[in-house]
């Protein structure tokens, strides 16, 4: 990002590179690393983030999107909202509830879901800053009986909260780092 800042290029939001890749590298299987990391690095596959849910505000642990164990796959039902660029995404990394526990964070798992799967619907959220008119960035993503292979589970079932906290170390600020670097250089000049 220093090179981009030096060239005065705008920052970018690459959910694959800046968010899910570190999680896959730290907690994914060798097969997941081989399958996903090359396409993330080349930007062949575009990712979006499925954390927030309608009616939950910033309380991620209150999530209701459920992934039911069906043997060789999960059956996912629920919705995610404020999902940036979901209309262009090939994959979504998603927090889902795989069990009901006394401590809500313990029943959460981290799944990688193909956005082209049957049962996924993306609806735009029109905001005041949609520019130009008719374009949007954020969406609600609905999951209705979406089959997700078990091999798309990152790490262990029920440990998604740990992986989500790890991801948040990379999420905040990455999109602005080149702009901040540019401003710092201007102040020094």
Predicted regions and their residues:
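Glycine-rich beta->alpha junctions and the first turn(s) of the following alpha-helix
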Residues: 15, 121-189
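Structural signature of FAD isoalloxazine-binding scaffolds in flavoprotein oxidoreductases
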Residues: 59-63, 142
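A structural signal for short hydrophobic beta-strand segments in well-ordered beta-sheet cores
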Residues: 65-68
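A short, Trp-centered hydrophobic/proline-enriched beta-strand micro-motif
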Residues: 43-51
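Short Gly/Pro-enriched turn/cap motifs at secondary-structure boundaries
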Residues: 13, 55-58, 82-85, 100-102, ...
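Internal helix-loop-helix
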Residues: 1-34, 38-44, 85-91, 156, ...
């Amino acid at each position: 990002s220093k090179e981009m800042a030096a060239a005065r290029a705008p920052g970018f939001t690459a959910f694959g590179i800046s968010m899910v890749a570190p999680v896959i590298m730290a907690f994914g299987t060798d097969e997941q690393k081989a399958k996903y990391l090359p396409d993330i690095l080349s930007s062949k596959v575009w990712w979006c983030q499925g954390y927030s849910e309608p009616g939950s505000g910033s309380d991620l642990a209150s999530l209701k999107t459920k992934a039911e164990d069906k043997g060789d796959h999960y059956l996912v039902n629920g919705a995610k909202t404020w999902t940036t660029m979901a209309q262009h995404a090939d994959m979504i990394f998603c927090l889902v509830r795989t069990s009901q526990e006394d401590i809500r964070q313990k029943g959460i798992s981290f799944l990688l879901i193909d956005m082209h799967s049957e049962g996924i619907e993306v609806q735009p959220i029109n905001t005041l800053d949609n520019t130009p008119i008719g374009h949007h960035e954020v969406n609600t993503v609905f999951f209705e009986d979406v089959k997700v292979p078990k091999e798309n589970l990152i790490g262990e079932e029920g440990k998604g909260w740990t992986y989500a906290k790890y991801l948040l170390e990379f999420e905040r600020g990455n999109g602005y780092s080149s702009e901040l670097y540019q401003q710092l250089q201007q102040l020094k000049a």
